[in-house]
């Protein structure tokens, strides 16, 4: 599905943190997919399309992202986003989920797992922030640019000339040249819908701090939910060592799998391989 079709299917639900945008497909056990910085639930379009026969797949837009609407004073930190996920599940009357996270969304999933372990049926983490690697060294220039007030101009440049996006985010993609204009529009256009939407994204990035993940580390080390660690091996932001760190830190880890030459956004670029791992993980978790 393209971006227009994705947003046409989007629904919204009220939570104490704001009006949360989400898209869902399928029936059965709920899988909740959590994207990372700058993106939105569209990252998971291939998972929704291909895994809907395995369960009810829901891709949510985080606070300060996509079509989620919040107040100008709403906390948008990663811990606040973890609490929002719990509020979202409450509003949807969902008890437990198979949680899947990528990039900063994977860090948010770790915080959620630590704070709300009983709401996990299973956990799957792809290349993501962990421990004290937040923000990653290679992402710090972007964080500094945002802190200096450059986000609005950067987003405008990326939307006016999509090659700017492909160049800037090339390290996050295995094949950046294959990222179509519609995908870039779908990710970035909501962030410039108003000055407040751009400021919300600024606040999200400015709140990056490894204290959020370090703070919940002891609870994370008690998470027993069956956990899959799936990692692209060619990632300048999240080195392979972090997949090993997570596998050792989370006692529920059942499998760690490497995707050779893949980068952060391999769930978007290599969905067949990743979805096969998710299917197997969910099946094994349901029989645990």
Which residues are covered by each model-predicted region?
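Flexible "cap/lid" subdomain of the alpha/beta-hydrolase fold that forms the substrate-access gate
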Residues: 6-12, 20-23, 58, 65-100, ...
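A generic "binding-loop/recognition-motif" signal
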Residues: 18, 27-28, 262
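Conserved HGGG/HGGXW glycine-rich cap/lid loop of the alpha/beta-hydrolase fold
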Residues: 23-67
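Catalytic histidine-centered segment of alpha/beta-hydrolase-like enzymes
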Residues: 262-271, 275
